[in-house]
Amino acid sequence: MQRIGVFVCWCGSNIAATVDVKAVSEALGHEPGVVFSTNYQYMCSEAGQNIIKDAIKEHHLTGVVICSCSPRMHEATFRKTVAAAGLNSYMLEVANIREQCSWIHKDKAEATEKAIILGRAAIAKVQLNAPLTAGESPVTKRALVIGGG
């Protein structure tokens, strides 16, 4: 069975003003396969990344879910963080609860429920992920251009 850690980011008040991050963290902590769940003001900060690394080592996590801002913003940061802790960087899923919840909802209960749903989806996905490794393919350095006008 997978050992998944869930990390819910406040993004300062960007997320925490609209989403009850503590309720999200608590709800996702009860999902099957989740052995650790917490929340922190800025998961992308050095302190936040250290929380992730320490939890991976202490709880022997096999997968990580981060509920935060857009993956475009910090997915590379979080992949490096989990890799630095010894976990395959592809055993990470990011649930975008900033742009998809807090920035579009005014009702805190609705935004919180949607954040929990997005977190559950990310947990389900990381349970299906498999560790990947980067590979190389031979390339023949030739090209044929047809047309050109």
Q: What does each model-identified segment do?
A:
Residues 1-149:
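Residues forming the flavin
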